[in-house]
Amino acid sequence: MQVLASLFGRSPFSPLQAHVELVSASIEVLFPLFSAIKEGDYQRVEALAQLVSSKERQADGVKNDIRSHLASGVFIPVSRLAMLEIISTQDSVADCAEDIAILLTVKELRFYPEFEEIFFQFLQKTVQSFEVVAKAIREMDLLLESSFGGCRAEKTRVLVNEVSNLEHECDLLQRELMKILFSENFSIETKDFVLWTQIIKRLSGISNNSEKLAYRVGMTLEEK
């Protein structure tokens, strides 16, 4: 709590940025996780899954501390509701990442050649959608310096639109993946089918929440 208080003293957005770094750290593990699945390195899968869970727990702790500080009346230049919505949505991204990590440890899952390539495209776009909105969060101090206007605000709007476009691309790739999984010509073990559909759903949750987060950041500009 004392550490967080010092962050609030440095900048009203520093705690939010500290939280987004932990969420980002959990998202960054997804590529190595799925690469380990591809290589059949299940010990590495277990180790990386534990790392994701550790980052998610740390993010939860920061989230709860931020909520406590907001309740105590600390000054912030945006509405408390906006701040709470942003932190909650960020945390939902970390939750999705942890869910994926847990699902990957349920059994020794494998890729099927019919969807491996498109899956990694889907994964790349999903991770990218969060990376873009995380960039907007990291630059909120600069927004404050510009009084939420000018070129800095326009740059943030561009990032918000980029996230929306990426989320749409994720939707299209998700649809293609589901078509493959449900195709009558595609053969897959029942347990694998259940796990892959759940994994795809959780990955979609990351891009959906990234879009929600970007929208909320964009709304802070309109509220000024």
From Swiss-Prot:
PANTHER family: UPF0111 PROTEIN HI_1603
Cross-referenced InterPro entries: DUF47, PhoU-like_sf, Put_Phosphate_transp_reg
One matching Pfam family: PhoU_div
Species this protein is from: Chlamydia muridarum (strain MoPn / Nigg)
Stated family: Belongs to the UPF0111 family.
Name this polypeptide is given: UPF0111 protein TC_0063
The organism's place on the tree of life at top rank: Bacteria
